[in-house]
A protein has these predicted regions:
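Positively charged n-region of N-terminal signal peptides that target proteins for export
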Residues: 1-13
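C-terminal motif of bacterial Sec signal peptides marking the signal peptidase cleavage site
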Residues: 18-21
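A residue-level marker of the well-folded mature domains of exported/periplasmic proteins
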Residues: 24-29, 33-392
Length: 392
């Protein structure tokens, strides 16, 4: 319950900070040197001492290592925003390192920071970094690691890992897509076909997809779901190409889950004059000023509040309440996934009846009344059987 209270508090405090993406072949970083007299929560508030680490807040270093790059208006930017919010709250030194999707940089970059005593906590996202975290954490048992969007099945005593229940949010996105494609909405056609464009295949992306499929088919089992993979999270041209191709095959709504590459998918939907569904942040609102043409076709987004997750986990680590060696899953009940509904596009595109239906589905899902399947921990044969139901 304490963890959920912290989440609830930070939901109102975290602000989205977007930064431009840097190079792809060498790890790049952005460092924030917070005030050394920053305070902590609990009994030591105002004294600047973090008892869990035996240091003043300003002497603590927290580094965020991202598998890809900032500038995605999605999970990377949100994660960095969460780090910066926590740094402002506690006063520790913060650094964000971008790996640019280069797998050869994962282990050496983590080793560099694990061997440097100036860095007390290494936060890693997302699932593609799991094996590297496990390797380096075993090599450096005194270094603390926070891994999000992946589970450390080894239960290493210096690692806290967690998954977002993106399947739950994606289920709602699927329901939204199905409601539009079967309606008389201006951009809907008669094909009863929707799409999904993912970045690179991994467990987290499969979790999005399985939830999306189930959500679509909960409305109409005969809806055809086109599935395409970009192969990485940075190729915006490929993302756009796949969106245009799916539109040509009859899709009138596409769910984009592909990081920076997903911005290309959203642009492809706008070019093809079909609806798109964004991911992680409210991408309609985020893109409205910089790319209003693309934003105009985003009917909603499945948010995943990685900013809240990162800031909450760091806060718990500094407060001494994070259970190292354990694993958690946060979803609808924790307020970290859901649909972006508080914007003009959602309110104008969906009818009152559709909005009421979506509210009811979200309420039932949050209350645990719906059995939403998850790819996390699922047998691969079962997973493939479910994924095969997408195409009719």
């Amino acid at each position: 319950m304490k963890g959920k209270k912290i989440i609830a508090l930070l939901l109102t405090a975290v602000m989205l900070l977007s930064m431009a993406a840097c190079g792809q072949k060498t790890a790049t970083d952005t460092t924030t040197a917070a005030a050394a007299d920053g305070t902590t929560s609990g009994e030591t508030a105002g004294e600047g001492l973090v008892e869990a680490f035996g240091k003043k807040a300003g002497d603590i270093g927290v580094v965020l290592i991202l598998n890809t790059n900032l500038g995605d208006h999605a999970i990377c930017d949100l994660s960095d925003a969460g780090l910066q919010e926590a740094a402002a709250m506690y006063g520790f030194r913060a650094k964000t390192v971008e790996l640019g999707g280069d797998v050869t940089l994962q282990v050496p970059t983590m080793q560099e920071y694990a061997e440097d005593p100036d860095w007390d906590i290494i936060v890693c996202g997302t699932s593609n970094l799991k094996e590297a975290v496990q390797q380096v954490a075993e090599e450096h048992p005194d270094q603390k690691f926070i891994l999000y969007d992946a589970q450390d099945e080894k239960g290493l005593p210096n690692v806290f890992s967690m998954d977002h229940c993106q399947n739950e949010g994606a289920y709602l996105a699927g329901v939204a897509a199905a409601l539009l494609t079967t309606s008389e909405a201006p951009l809907a056609n008669a094909e009863k076909t929707v799409g999904f464009v993912g970045g690179g295949e991994n467990t987290a992306l499969d979790d999005y997809l399985i939830g999306y499929i189930q959500g679509v088919h909960s409305v109409d089992e005969d809806i055809n779901i086109l599935v395409s993979w970009i192969g990485d999270f940075k190729d915006t041209a490929k993302g756009k190409e796949l969106a245009v191709a799916q539109a040509g095959q009859g899709a009138d709504v596409i769910f984009s889950v592909a990081g920076i590459a997903g911005l290309g998918t959203l642009a492809g939907c706008a070019e093809s004059n079909i609806y798109s569904i964004g991911v992680d942040s409210d991408q309609y609102t985020v893109l409205l000023e910089t790319d209003p043409t693309t934003a105009a076709n985003i009917c909603t987004s499945m948010y995943k509040k990685a900013d809240v997750t990162v800031s909450t986990l760091i806060a718990k680590a500094l407060d001494g309440t994070l259970e190292w060696g354990s694993y958690a899953k946060w979803g609808l009940q924790d307020g970290v996934v859901g649909l972006a509904t508080d914007n003009d596009n959602y309110q104008s595109i969906f009818s009152e009846e559709q909005k009421s239906y979506l509210e009811g589905v979200q309420a039932d899902a949050t209350a645990g009344k719906l059995e939403i399947l998850s790819a996390i921990g699922m047998d691969n044969d079962q997973l493939q059987q479910i994924l095969a139901t997408a195409t009719k």
